[in-house]
From Swiss-Prot:
The gene is phyA. The active site is at H82 (nucleophile). Keywords: Disulfide bond, Glycoprotein, Hydrolase, Secreted, Signal. InterPro entries: Acid_Pase_AS, His_Pase_clade-2, His_PPase_superfam, Histidine_acid_Pase_euk. Belongs to the histidine acid phosphatase family. One of its GO terms (molecular function) is acid phosphatase activity. Residues 1-19 form the signal peptide. 1D-myo-inositol hexakisphosphate binds at Y51, R81, H82, R85, T88, R165, K301, H361, D362. CDD domains: HP_HAP_like. The lineage of its organism: Eukaryota, Fungi, Dikarya, Ascomycota, Pezizomycotina. Monomer. Glycans are attached at N27, N105, N120, N207, N230, N339, N352, N376. It is found in: Secreted. Disulfide bonds join C31-C40, C71-C414, C215-C465, C264-C282, C436-C444. This is Phytase A.
């Protein structure tokens, strides 16, 4: 496969953690913070699936988040989704068309619908919103603070997929990280700012563990779309009927209903730089309907990129094998989507670093989490009935891949242990690991953790891609 890499800097990294008490960015609203993420309108915003802004799941964690006093973090791999963005180009056109049709055909716009009469669709497509940029600055600050005994003296090695919103997210993470360091009187004042070290091209011509493109059978799959269509047919017609009764002259398809619901999160994350203003589209739907919408988006990701798609998890195998290499300081062994040109070069894939941060897309994160076995306890999701997180073993799109989602794979050395221990945090939720013996703090011994990644080490079912 061909390769094009933007190599901005190479850092030498070594290190160990506690937590610097640095203040949040000054323009935060009371419900949006570095430590807890987006807690504005939680009864709504936490039901926006993959369009929900990141919010901390610490209170939902089955294990404590704190690191024991007798342990020291020695390694961290961060994996993050880009921040809040405008809709994709195709969705922007679809949303605008739905609104235009309503404006053309409705004979009256009563009450909560009044804003629609003169509404002007003005969102762009694909790019980060100002709020999305701030999310990644916050993540950089959070990462610095959480691992400050390391970050005061060490820079993370940073990679990003070559999508503008992903690359910019990585750059904003760097800004937040460095701003936090500059505000820390205990930091090394001579340590240069981190930079985005490697940008990996996207597309079918390139192997890239941070963006899926090359598994032909997977790219042609319609499993996710079919599952989403099945559930949409269950709940959307009743909503369409209600809206049509409220807006005489209007006829709405199931897709129109989903388009109008999507306008709620997308406009909310676009209106202000801290998303403190709720879009008027949000008030057009009931709490029960938002629960259904949230489940629809979870279903779509599960059957599109997760365990519900036979070729979903294998899309994350390459990254899982890179993680194994970094944890064990050994060369990458993979025959799936790893870019061997990059990973064989210590300048573009160092094995001796302490801190790593990779930036990608929501779909890739879903596949990676399944390749790591984090949701092995999640059974096939119903396509006709809403299931909550107690029924899905903690899986939901809003809990897993919201805007600015972040996973931290930590390795720690503890006084009573000869071997380092590994745990995984997804949006501040310490994950119940599968495939290895877990202690009462959610940790496995490193060698057991690696051994448990048997699906990834065997290359999954990659042969079925072609």
């Amino acid at each position: 496969m061909g390769v094009f890499v933007v190599l901005l800097s190479i850092a030498t990294l070594f290190g160990s953690t506690s937590g610097t008490a640095l203040g949040p960015r000054g323009n935060h609203s009371d419900c949006n913070s570095v430590d807890h993420g987006y807690q504005c309108f939680p009864e709504l915003s936490h039901k926006w699936g993959l369009y929900a802004p990141y919010f901390s799941l610490q209170d939902e964690s089955p294990f404590p988040l704190d690191v024991p006093d007798d342990c020291q973090i020695t390694f961290v791999q961060a994996l993050a989704r880009h921040g809040a963005r405008s809709p994709t180009d195709s969705k922007t056109k679809a949303y605008a068309a739905t609104i235009a049709a309503i404006q053309k055909n409705a004979t009256t716009f009563p009450g909560k619908y009044a804003f629609l009469k003169s509404y002007n669709y003005s969102m762009g497509s694909e790019d980060l919103t100002p709020f999305g940029r701030n999310q990644l600055q916050d993540m950089g600050a959070q990462f610095y603070r959480r691992y400050d005994t390391l970050t005061r003296h060490i820079n993370p090695f940073i990679r990003a997929a070559d999508s503008s919103r992903v690359h910019e997210s990585a750059e904003k993470f760097v800004e937040g990280f460095q701003n936090a360091r500059q505000g820390d009187p205990r930091a090394n004042p001579h340590q240069p700012s981190p930079r985005v070290d490697v940008v990996i091209p996207e597309g079918t011509a390139y192997n890239n563990t941070l963006e899926h493109s090359i598994c032909t059978a997977f790219e042609d799959s319609t499993v996710g779309d079919a599952a989403a269509d099945n559930f949409t047919a269950v709940f959307a017609p009743a909503i369409a009927k209600r809206l049509e009764a409220d807006l005489p002259g209007v006829q709405l398809s199931a897709d129109d209903v989903i388009n109008l619901m999507a306008m709620c999160p997308f406009e909310t994350v676009s209106l202000t730089d801290d998303a403190h203003t709720l879009s008027p589209f949000c008030d057009l739907f009931t709490a029960a309907e938002w629960t259904q919408y949230n489940y629809l988006l979870s279903l779509d990701k599960y059957y599109g990129y997760g365990g519900g798609n036979p070729l979903g998890p294998v899309q994350g195998v390459g990254w899982a094998n890179e993680l194994i290499a970094r944890l064990t300081h050994s060369p990458v062994h993979d025959h799936t989507c790893v870019n061997n040109t990059l990973d064989a070069n210590p300048a573009t894939f160092p094995l001796n670093a302490t801190l790593y941060a990779d930036f990608s897309h929501d779909s890739n994160l879903v596949s990676i989490f399944w390749a790591l076995g984090l949701y092995n306890g999640t059974k096939a999701l119903s396509q006709t009935t809403v299931e909550d997180t107690t029924q899905t073993d903690g899986y939901a799109a809003a809990w897993t891949v919201p805007f600015a989602a972040r996973a931290y794979i930590e390795m720690m050395q503890c006084r009573a242990e000869k071997q380092p221990l590994v745990r995984v945090l997804v949006n501040d939720r310490v994950m119940p690991l599968h495939g290895c013996a877990v202690d009462n703090l959610g940790r496995c011994k490193r060698d057991d953790f690696v051994e448990g990644l048997s699906f990834a080490r065997a290359g999954g079912n990659w042969a079925e891609c072609f």
